[in-house]
């Protein structure tokens, strides 16, 4: 079981319960898919705005702009490692997710779910630094999102 902590820090986000439910469903689907159902850990999600995300992105990545999602693993994991007591933190910027969903003709909830899945996979050691890593991570995202009844987010991009 993984404990989920949600913090909503800006206006415009749906209620905390809905964000918790989306996160819980995504997390359970990921952990089942990766055969990690028995892991005991904790994850924190901060739902914020572009202004705060740009500050965090500048501080931690040297990029003075907002982004959709950032993940901060509590401990560095390699793919396949079992997480420790704290999985890590995920930060999501509302305006960026809304704009991307509109530009890609996706529902906000589906795109938000994708960003949560993407962030959790980063916490579990998955990356997209190389073409091979990106292909592997995208394929995993596709499979997980399909289980969540969400269309392939990369279909139009391929």
Swiss-Prot record:
Keywords: Cytoplasm, Endonuclease, Hydrolase, Metal-binding, Nuclease, Ribosome biogenesis, rRNA processing, Zinc. GO terms for cellular component: cytoplasm. It is found in: Cytoplasm. SUPFAM superfamilies: Metalloproteases ('zincins'), catalytic domain. It comes from the Bacteria. The gene is ybeY. It is an enzyme of class 3 (hydrolase). Single strand-specific metallo-endoribonuclease involved in late-stage 70S ribosome quality control and in maturation of the 3' terminus of the 16S rRNA. NCBIfam families: rRNA maturation RNase YbeY (TIGR00043). Its EC number is 3.1.-.-. Pfam families: YbeY (PF02130). It comes from Bartonella henselae (strain ATCC 49882 / DSM 28221 / CCUG 30454 / Houston 1) (Rochalimaea henselae). Gene3D superfamilies: Metalloproteases ('zincins'), catalytic domain. Belongs to the endoribonuclease YbeY family. Zn(2+) binds at residues 118, 122, 128. This is Endoribonuclease YbeY. Its cofactor is Zn(2+).
